[in-house]
Structures are given as C-alpha cells and as structure tokens.
C-alpha cells in the first residue's frame, strides 16, 4: 500500500507519495505530483551570503546552512511562496562537512510542518567560491 498525504490534495493540486516499495524516511518525501492550476516557483542555488554579498559563517557549516535557508525563505517570499510550498530541494555539500549540523539547521527551520519535500543531495569537491560549504536550490508549488 502506498502512503499518500492528502493535506494539499484537497485542492487537487499537490500530492505527497511514499510508496511502500521505497524506503520511508520522515525527513523527505519520495514522490510529489502536481496537477491543476498552480504557480511553480524555482529558486536558483542559494549560498551563505547576506544582502550585501558578504559570506556568512566562513568555515562554519551550521551557520552557512542557516543563512542559506534564510535566503531560500526570502526568495520564496519574493515569488509568492512559503517554505511549506517547497516540493523539491537539491543540496550540494562540500565533501567533509558535518551533515548533522546542516540537518539540524534544516529541522529548526522546517519545524513541525507536514510533507517534507523530495530531496536530492550530492557531495561536491567545491562550489563557486572557495568559502562556500553548501548550496541549495528549491522548487515550490503554490496552489491558486
């Protein structure tokens, strides 16, 4: 049997699916389907920079994760979306970073919201600036 979340499906637009044929993890959803009239918001890769372009948390993965999530929330808001509208994250993390700190920052921001998004994560040798430790992009679906 497939576990389906109906929280947003009542509007007939977003359905979160965790089929029993795939590993279940409360940190992410395996499949998200979108139907109907919706607005899709694409947030390009965000790094740990503040509004002046200064890098926040040089050498501190947790501080950078917190800034990245703050930037994503600001980008989502600019696009008319909220964090709970995110259906997909892509995370790029420089090899050797303490993942637990990044996940703790994510959980602190995500809180008790239902339906965590589908997630892809890749370890990389480096990013656009040598002080960047992570980058995250997101896709959000806003019911109309």
Can you say where each PLM-predicted feature lies in the sequence?
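N-terminal presequence-like segments and the immediate start of the first folded domain
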Residues: 1-70, 74-87, 93-144
């Amino acid at each position: 049997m497939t576990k389906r979340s109906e929280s947003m499906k009542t509007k007939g637009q977003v359905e979160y699916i965790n089929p029993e044929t795939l590993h279940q993890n409360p940190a992410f959803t395996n499949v998200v389907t979108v139907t109907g009239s919706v607005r899709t918001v694409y947030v390009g890769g965000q790094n740990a920079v503040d509004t002046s372009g200064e890098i926040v948390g040089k050498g501190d993965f947790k501080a950078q994760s917190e800034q990245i999530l703050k930037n994503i929330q600001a980008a989502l808001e600019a696009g008319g979306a909220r964090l709970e509208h995110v259906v997909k994250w892509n995370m790029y993390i420089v090899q050797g970073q303490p993942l637990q700190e990044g996940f703790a920052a994510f959980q602190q921001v995500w809180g008790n919201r239902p339906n965590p998004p589908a997630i892809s994560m890749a370890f990389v040798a480096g990013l656009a600036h040598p002080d960047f430790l992570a980058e995250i992009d997101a896709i959000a679906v806003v019911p109309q």
